[in-house]
């Protein structure tokens, strides 16, 4: 069926479009304008038309996500029972995630922490999220097998083969490195780790582990750069860790997760841990400007109750003292040790207010929103449903000033946010939430409205209240089919799980099988993600090609 979206303000920065025009769709794809009469015309007069939103970093599936629901069941408001069902969905469930992203105009979301040892369970949860295409990033950097290879000096080929085998068996879309060596060091009593500190038992450092993974990702041709969670997250002086890690990449492609939590400069150099922190947003952005090989997502903080989820067991163990309410879970399992710690970002608290300001400052200082991706590191900085409010604050300096006026003076004393007058345009919002994350993930078929793109389209009524505008899309199309009308889901269906098209090296498979049998008494099949685990004839997975 040929469909024309007519009369809307079409915003597609990848094509230089920001004007009233039409978008043509046929067979689930954007097509060139046709001389044929459309079978259907969608009136978008008075509306803004964008590609569907793309989420690059949101914790939406996996063991720690499940644990967070059990630990803090009151975090989300439960939904009403669907028609024909006796029970309501649990708050934060797959249907809640899919519906709330779709209402905001998002059509793709990525879970950034896919533990290879828990890959099947995580993929089953991802497959339970309706309306969205989704994927996961395989976590490496603390597992004993990789660290053994590096300790024994087996060379780049062996590391590459192990990374490729892990991607193939976990069906990951990319690779994430979380405080490389930190979980391993924690098991030997280490409570703080920096880039060049030695990791007990292995004689390695974060720098060496990360460098090996950077090389492997490039050699395999993974479209998404190595997704890095640095040392010392959330501590005064964390900006030093990010900048040092950026320089250690030595020009190789690298993506930094939740940069806001690293944009903390030391206030008192003589008492760095007790003197508090100040914004290092200017320093972080200057460093990024000097290194075009790098990108980051923000990890914006929003006020209110949340729960922090991370495989960075060092940080979660340290953060347990600030848990609110006072309950937490810490796990030191092989490779994927981590923790779940509830946290309250107090609306008038000086620390929370400064964190809030730093995230906005990072985005408003960025000269290239395509390299500055909007995230809240859901749920760590807050719930992703706050994106519309964040967008409002970026687009409206007056609204931002009103909010700042309600916050403690520390926001002006230790950040530059109150002095920034910049307002984001629609094109910059599209870069921040569409073209930037799609390009970063290597998903060339989305994030834009050029010919050949997936017909994932969001149509918003142009409203000066940008929070309202982006909270409830007028119409959302997924593969050309309407899934949301006037902010309500009108059709439920399952999207695809995106996974990298790679094959495991036969020799490394044999080595991995032997290693796992010796260590766990279980082989590769135990950790596999077979098609048979998913409903027949649904085509759950969709391959994403490696870079040439």
Swiss-Prot record:
Cofactor info, note text: Binds 2 Zn(2+) ions per subunit.
Subcellular location: Cytoplasm
Source species, domain of life: Bacteria
Molecular-function GO term, any one: hydrolase activity, acting on carbon-nitrogen (but not peptide) bonds
Pathway: One-carbon metabolism; formaldehyde degradation; formate from formaldehyde (H(4)MPT route): step 4/5
InterPro entries assigned to the protein according to its UniProt record, in alphabetical order: Amidohydro_3, Formylmethanofuran_DH_asu, Metal-dep_hydrolase_composite, Metal_Hydrolase, Metallo-dep_Hydrolases_sf
Primary location recorded for the protein, binned into one broad class: cytoplasm
Swiss-Prot/TrEMBL keywords: Cytoplasm, Hydrolase, Metal-binding, One-carbon metabolism, Zinc
Its EC number(s): 3.5.1.-
Necessary cofactors: Zn(2+)
UniProt KW Cytoplasm keyword: yes
Subunit structure: Octaheteromer. Part of the formyltransferase/hydrolase complex fhc; composed of FhcA, FhcB, FhcC and FhcD.
Family: Belongs to the metallo-dependent hydrolases superfamily. FwdA/FmdA family.
Entry protein name: Formyltransferase/hydrolase complex Fhc subunit A
Source species: Methylorubrum extorquens (strain ATCC 14718 / DSM 1338 / JCM 2805 / NCIMB 9133 / AM1)
């Amino acid at each position: 069926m040929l469909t024309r979206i007519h009369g809307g303000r079409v915003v597609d920065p990848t094509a230089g479009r920001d004007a009233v025009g039409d978008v043509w769709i046929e067979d689930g794809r954007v097509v060139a304008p046709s001389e044929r009469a459309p079978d259907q015309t969608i009136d978008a007069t008075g509306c803004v038309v964008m590609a569907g939103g793309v989420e690059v970093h949101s914790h939406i599936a996996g063991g720690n996500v499940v644990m967070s629901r059990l630990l803090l069941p009151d975090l989300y408001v439960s939904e009403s029972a669907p028609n024909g069902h006796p029970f309501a969905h649990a708050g934060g469930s797959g249907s809640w995630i899919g519906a709330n992203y779709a209402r905001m105009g998002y059509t793709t979301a990525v879970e950034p922490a896919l533990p290879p040892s828990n890959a099947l369970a995580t993929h089953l949860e991802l497959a339970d999220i309706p309306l969205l295409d989704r994927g996961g990033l395989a976590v490496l950097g603390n597992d004993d097998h990789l660290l053994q290879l590096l300790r024994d000096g087996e060379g780049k080929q062996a590391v590459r083969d192990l990374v490729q085998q892990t991607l193939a068996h976990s069906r990951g879309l990319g690779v994430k490195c979380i405080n490389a060596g930190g979980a391993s060091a924690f098991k030997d009593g280490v409570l703080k780790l920096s880039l060049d500190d030695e990791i007990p038992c292995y004689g390695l450092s974060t720098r060496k582990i990360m460098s090996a993974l950077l090389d492997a990702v490039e050699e395999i041709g993974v479209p998404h750069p190595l997704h890095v969670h640095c040392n010392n997250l959330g501590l005064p002086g964390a900006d030093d860790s990010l900048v040092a890690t950026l320089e250690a990449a030595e020009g190789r492609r690298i993506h930094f997760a939740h940069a806001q939590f690293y944009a903390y400069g030391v206030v008192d150099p003589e008492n760095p841990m007790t003197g508090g922190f100040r914004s290092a947003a200017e320093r972080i952005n200057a460093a990024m400007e000097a290194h075009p090989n790098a990108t980051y997502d923000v990890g914006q903080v929003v006020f209110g109750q949340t729960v922090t989820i991370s495989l960075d067991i060092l940080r979660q163990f340290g953060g347990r003292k600030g848990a609110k309410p006072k309950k937490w879970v810490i796990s030191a399992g092989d490779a994927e040790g981590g923790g779940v710690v509830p946290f309250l970002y107090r609306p008038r608290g000086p620390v929370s207010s400064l964190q809030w300001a730093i995230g906005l400052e990072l985005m408003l200082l960025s000269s290239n929103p395509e390299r500055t991706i909007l995230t809240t590191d859901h749920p760590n900085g807050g719930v992703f449903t706050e994106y519309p409010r964040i967008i409002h604050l970026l687009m409206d300096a007056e609204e931002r000033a009103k909010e700042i006026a309600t916050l403690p003076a520390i926001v002006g004393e230790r950040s530059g946010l109150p002095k920034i007058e910049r307002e984001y345009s629609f094109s910059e919002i599209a870069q921040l939430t569409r073209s930037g994350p799609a390009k970063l993930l290597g998903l060339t078929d989305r994030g834009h409205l050029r010919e050949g793109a997936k017909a994932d389209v969001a149509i918003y009524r142009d409203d000066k209240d940008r929070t309202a505008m982006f909270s409830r899309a007028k119409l959302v199309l997924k593969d050309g089919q309407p899934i949301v009308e006037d902010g309500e889901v009108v059709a439920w269906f399952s999207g695809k799980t995106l996974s990298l098209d790679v094959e495991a090296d036969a020799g490394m498979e044999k080595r991995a099988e032997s290693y796992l049998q010796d260590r766990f008494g279980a082989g590769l099949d135990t950790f596999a993600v077979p098609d048979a685990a998913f409903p027949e004839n649904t085509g759950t997975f969709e391959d994403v090609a490696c870079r040439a």
